[in-house]
Design a protein with these regions (language model features):
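Electrostatic cytochrome c docking/interface patches
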Residues: 29-55, 67-68, 73, 120-142, ...
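Gly/Gly-Pro-rich "capping" loops immediately C-terminal to redox-active cysteine motifs
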Residues: 65-94, 105-109, 144-146, 153-179, ...
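Extracytoplasmic c-type cytochrome modules immediately beyond a signal peptide or single-pass transmembrane anchor
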Residues: 23-26, 55, 68-76, 84-137
């Protein structure tokens, strides 16, 4: 499939979006605010049924509860309840090289913008609804996270990922990639570079235990016609 022209993600700085943000800061205080995110380009209207067909192979990993893949081994992310707009942005990142992941690049390199919008809508399902309440006090390293990802881990805007109930080891891996350049996002690199391994572990542990939680996308069919 050819790439669509309506969504020129690479023309917009991923750093400005903070779209892949697992927004964390160690040296900043809770009173400080997160960097403002630019408004991303409009995405195509989604066709969920087409998204179901597009994601047929995706569920080979994302449809198995607790499944781990890639090297080093870590859990593939929970997608059910995630923001579809964020998922589409993430897919663009894998396709266009802003996220280094061989498997995900191979899965997305032939997808058009429309394909990714459709796939994201199907995989996300109904987004999580925020309770508006924090579960205890976030660790110091995560104080700034809640400004984008919510006090209960439910993102405050659809361009950000919700983190509530996400696999702990996946959050650790994502932060490590932002810190070391596996994900090209200058805003997140700035945040993650200030975190020690212990800080990253604390952030991941906190968000992974929050509810309402993301879930594994179910695999309701084995053939495209079902």
């Amino acid at each position: 499939m050819g790439r669509g022209r309506g969504f020129k993600l690479r023309a917009v700085s991923i750093a400005a979006l903070a779209a892949g943000a697992l927004a964390v800061a160690h040296t900043q205080t809770p009173a400080e605010t997160a960097p403002a995110a630019a408004t991303p380009p409009a995405q195509p209207a989604a066709d969920v049924q087409h998204g179901k067909a597009v994601t047929y192979t995706c569920l080979g990993c994302h449809g198995i509860e607790g499944y781990k893949n890639a090297y080093p081994m870590y859990s593939v992310p929970e997608l059910r309840g995630q923001n579809a707009e964020y998922l589409a942005i993430a897919l663009h990142g894998y396709r266009d090289g802003d996220r280094a992941h061989i498997t995900m690049h191979s899965q997305t390199e032939t997808l058009s913008d429309q394909d990714m919008a459709d796939a994201a809508a199907f995989l996300a399902g109904k987004p999580l609804v925020s309770s508006g309440k924090a579960a205890g006090t976030p660790p110091q390293a995560a104080q700034l996270c809640v400004s984008c990802h919510g006090p209960d881990g439910v993102a405050v805007a659809p361009i950000y990922p919700s983190l509530a109930g996400q696999h702990e080891d996946y959050i650790v891996r994502a932060l490590d990639e932002y810190k070391h350049g596996g994900r090209k996002n200058l805003v997140m690199k700035q945040f993650a570079s200030n975190l020690s391994d212990a800080d990253i572990a604390a952030v991941a542990a906190y968000f992974s235990r929050l509810t309402p939680a993301l879930e594994t996308e179910p695999r309701p069919y084995t053939r495209l016609g079902e």
